[in-house]
């Protein structure tokens, strides 16, 4: 089949949705499909190249406690129609379909089978409340709906009720399994790792307070902070004024370096305060065999099993974080058991498994539409049969 993956965020700028799109693109191609990525332009990414098609220009805006993107173009309709007429997609797969405005324009003009994946989770959303009546017409054009977690499904279903298939995010298991620890930090001092954008919803201030409590108790440990963002200056000031000498800010790192850091860590901590639909970083930790301490929030409960792969702590609870981290620091055998349990569990989140589930869902939707005589005019591929079995190279964990 010819498949278009539509992302409202400027590809390949790093982010959870774009990471998802990237690996889904690669693995759908491995499974024999002809795939394109439809995105916007921004900065140095201005023109289409290879399988990446750019329409309009992306602008950064605050969204859900982080930064999002809206895409604008004075020639949207004609640009989109030209692309759709040229590419003849059988399936268009929209990621965050209601982020303005690229996905909405493509969806309105699509004559393909339209599938959407909902990635986000939030509490009350004024924008969605105001827009749901307008967007309901676009939602009616979706033939299939995927949510990356029960939390994401619950959030989307509040505004656009319907049938959702939960298919989780994936992780490149092999990259983290094969990574080599960084010798610089293999000096006998336990390493606690944080990876995330330095913004309010990721909860770094709570981890810094917890780490201060740990150090005041006399426990030896090092905190490695990966990421950048609006809270970086405040976080650095806190570390300096409290004399936390064993905290290192590493900024943004490459994918390869990130995998090495997960392999270097003795404990991974994700103290998110909420509004997380899933937690890909939790999968990355499990793939590396690193035990987890994380917030007890909706988006994380479907990934980490309490007491199996890690310990869950109420959000905003620095003392609880300190207690959980201290428990793992004091018990190497418990860390080893949780790390092994994580490596076992993460197999079901490998991109081979996830892509096979997505492909199977495409087939389910297409067969249902065909049986109802409602296949869109743009679909011209053979009707998929029963899904192929999932085969995973457990040693390599590819891709």
Model-identified regions with their sequence ranges:
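N-terminal strand-loop element at the rim of the active site
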Residues: 7-13, 21, 25-74
């Amino acid at each position: 089949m010819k498949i278009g993956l539509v992302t409202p965020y400027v590809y390949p700028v790093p982010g959870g949705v774009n990471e998802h799109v990237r690996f889904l693109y690669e693995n759908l191609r491995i499974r024999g499909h002809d795939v394109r990525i439809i995105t916007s332009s921004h900065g140095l990414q201005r023109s289409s190249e290879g399988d990446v098609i750019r329409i309009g220009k992306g602008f950064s805006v605050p969204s859900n406690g982080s930064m999002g993107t809206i895409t604008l173009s004075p020639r949207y309709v004609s640009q989109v129609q030209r692309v759709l007429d040229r590419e003849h997609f059988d399936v268009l797969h929209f990621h965050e379909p209601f982020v303005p405005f690229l996905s909405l324009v493509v969806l309105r003009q699509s004559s393909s089978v339209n599938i959407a994946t909902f990635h986000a989770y939030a509490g009350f959303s004024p924008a969605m409340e105001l827009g749901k009546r307008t967007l309901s017409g676009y939602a009616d054009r979706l033939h299939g709906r995927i949510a990356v977690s029960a939390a994401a499904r619950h959030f989307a279903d509040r505004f656009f009720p319907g049938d959702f298939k939960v298919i989780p995010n994936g992780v490149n298991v092999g990259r983290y399994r094969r990574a080599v620890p960084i010798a610089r930090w293999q000096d006998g001092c336990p390493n606690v790792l944080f990876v995330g954008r330095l913004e309010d919803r990721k909860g770094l201030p709570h981890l810094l307070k917890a780490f201060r409590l740990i150090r005041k108790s006399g426990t030896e440990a090092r905190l490695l902070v990966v990421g950048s963002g609006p809270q970086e200056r405040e976080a650095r000031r806190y570390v300096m004024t409290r004399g936390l000498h064993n905290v290192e800010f590493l900024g943004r790192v490459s994918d390869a370096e990130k995998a090495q850091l997960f392999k270097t860590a003795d404990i991974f901590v994700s103290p998110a305060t909420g509004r997380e639909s899933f937690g890909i970083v939790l999968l990355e930790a499990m793939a590396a065999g690193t035990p987890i301490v994380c917030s007890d929030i909706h988006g994380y409960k479907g990934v980490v099993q309490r007491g199996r792969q890690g310990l869950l702590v109420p959000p905003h609870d620095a003392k609880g974080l300190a207690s959980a981290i201290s428990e793992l620091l004091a018990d190497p055998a418990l860390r080893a058991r949780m790390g092994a349990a994580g490596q076992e569990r993460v197999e079901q989140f490998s991109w081979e498994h996830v892509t096979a589930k997505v492909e199977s869902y495409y087939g389910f939707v297409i067969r249902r539409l065909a049986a109802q005589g409602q296949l869109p005019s743009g679909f011209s591929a053979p009707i998929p049969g029963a899904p192929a079995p999932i085969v995973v190279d457990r040693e390599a964990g590819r891709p």
